[in-house]
Amino acid sequence: MARFLPISLSPIRRHSPPWSRQHLLLRPAPEPLFAPVVVEPTPLSANNPRIASLRRLSGRRKARLEAGRFVIEGPVPIAELLAAGADLDELYVDLDQWAQVDDRSPLRSVVRDADAAGVPVWGLTASVFASVSDTNSPQGALALALRTVTPISDVAQIDGPVLVLVDISDPGNAGTLVRAAEAAGCAGVVFVGSSTDPFGPKAVRAAAGSIVRLPIAEGSEVSPALDELRSSGRSLVATVVDGGVAPEATDLSGSVAILIGSEAHGLSAEVIATCSATITIPMQSAVESINAAVAGAVVLFEAARQRRNA
């Protein structure tokens, strides 16, 4: 009969020897299977004609209108425009910032995305980049995009409320209202009168991708623009500081155009007289009024609530 000798099992070590732990700690991280493609911006000299053109487009509304282009700054807003399908002509990068960031940074990422979309990528020195930037603390990326405006008659035919900005002068408010309008499901935003340029640098920063996803219309004259909206079957609703009805007590579920006036003076008496309803946001305490962008957002989201519940 066969005999089987017992096998001696060594106890399992709970701790590796010190040399083994040190060896493991010093092991280099494994290389990624697919390293990101390295895209290097093409340097431009300070005398390149593109630089002077960028300065004009960044600083002058007339130049943007003539060129049909606008400027957007910052890697994150530019990435949002790319994702929204915006037509970017060129991308400019601060070479100093470029050299200081790694492949996971938003700056490197947006350059890769732009290059993949066939957008030329140019590099500028820090001083030249600062001279074309509209911000005090440039974020290292600036792009040139197509300025697309939709006719008021086309915006009027789209389902959803239309936001009409009359003589809105602050670009930050304008951009914030564009973004709020998209979030609230508006058909589009119409800028009339002496309103700021919706494609100015500050307005674009506030609106981000909404500036290309949402139809934007412009009209220099207020009355013809309102007539166009009214003839399409839309009811005009004015927001006023006092004397109006609370937003929740006003029917905003149908085909409406909501008017917001200038930060300093609101809507004129003539414009208010052409509207079929007026809205006043109830406020407590001694506060007389709130920011135009805040007021607009309150009314827009009340309209969205009513449409959901209709």
Give the ranges of each region predicted by the language model:
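N-terminal positively charged helical leader segments and presequences
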Residues: 12-14, 19, 24-134
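RNA substrate-binding interface of SAM-dependent RNA methyltransferases
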Residues: 33, 104, 113-116, 122-127, ...
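Glycine- and other small-residue-rich loops at beta-strand/loop junctions that grip anionic moieties
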Residues: 43, 70, 166-167, 190-193, ...
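Glycine/charged-rich beta-loop-alpha catalytic/anionic-binding loops adjacent to active sites
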Residues: 61, 155-164, 274-283
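Short, ordered loop/turn segments at secondary-structure junctions
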Residues: 96, 193-196, 264
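Structured adenosyl-cofactor binding patch, chiefly the S-adenosyl-L-methionine
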Residues: 143, 180-184, 198-211, 269-310
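Active-site/ligand-binding-proximal alpha/beta "capping" segment
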Residues: 237-287
